[in-house]
Amino acid sequence: ALAWLTLGLIGVSAGAALALNVYYTDSAFARDDYRGMVRTINALATPQDAILLDAPGQRDVFSYYYRGNLPVLALPAQRPPLAAETTANLAADLAGKRRVYALFWATDESDPSRIVETWLDQHAYKVQDAWQGNVRFVIYSLPQATAPMQPLAVTFAPLADLAGLALSVPALPSGEVLEITLRWQVKAATAQRYKVFLQLLDGADQVWAQRDAEPAGESRPTSTWQPGEVIEDRHGLLIAPGTPPGRYRLIAGLYDAATGVRLRTSDADFVDLGLIEVTRPDAPWPRAAFTMQTVVDRQLGDVILLGYNHYPRGFSHAPETPLRRGDILHLDLFWQAVATPMQGQQMTVSLDGPASSQVVSEAGPLASAGYPSSQWQPGEIVRGQLDLTLPADLPAGVYRVVMHVPGTIPIAGADIGMVNIE
């Protein structure tokens, strides 16, 4: 059986301590954001989860930051890796686990045949795969049961038919992962690499959850597909903490990774996979589970505006992308209920120019029309979204984003940042 690492500063040697000092002072090491990865693990993990490190050199650095109680698995355990032993230990030690937080570093040396990742791609659902400096931080969801495959017949010409769909559950609380299996029947070979996209949309087509990735945990790019093949394609779609309870449409499709152009079905550039019910979690998510560019902490009537993010719509992955005239400025707003019951409060967000002249404004509920603030529970954190369409003739310059909550007496408001329009 695999040995689980016992982490803690007690076991750090003098040599390791010196190495850690270099890690904190050398910018080349600082780019590997172990502190941030540990913060994510601490915010999202439950006692049913596990952590995976694939390189011995990670142990001391990771243990400096991580003080939790989750089992930390060191795999592969041998050099060179032994495939049969490694996969057997993965199956045994991850049995009954809910999620795996994997930190992959120097995989060309530690696992050149991708034994660990191949097993996870085949048995788990990849939720996130992001570089943190030289470390890949990957989150997997582990299925608790086998979901039945529903037959489909949707052609994404000329590449493939979507022949089947399996969903782990029809309803789940925010903060959980929807496990999705797509079955592709390949019709034609291609040299192009297409990504699969999955989106959870509300009635106004606002995106509340999204996953973009190459098929099969990115292990089977479409450039390797051959006519007649059947590709089992697993994806984990995280329903972010704070997503308002309600019913959402799940859609899927394929787009060219180089150009962004989508493949079409007979009548659209996506397929509707049905409705998913998002419910309120049994316990509120802690504040640490929410990523905010800017913290505000201002009470506006019966709610607190904790903070916000803003970026051009569609660029949450690159929020520094410049805004231009005619673009859509997207806002993520993080609210916390102070008390209950409350009235169904509304907000107005405006873009103000010189001398506080209002350029454009939008009004709407704090989070969603289907989950008014009157239904929030004390202490609950809810994520809202709102879009501001910038006029095509808007002069370039710096503008202020201002929010007001009209239902308060006097009317409460808050500045929510400056934006530069190019």
What are these model-derived regions, one by one?
Residues 4-138, 151, 159, 190-199, ...:
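Catalytic lumenal/periplasmic loop and adjoining terminal transmembrane helix
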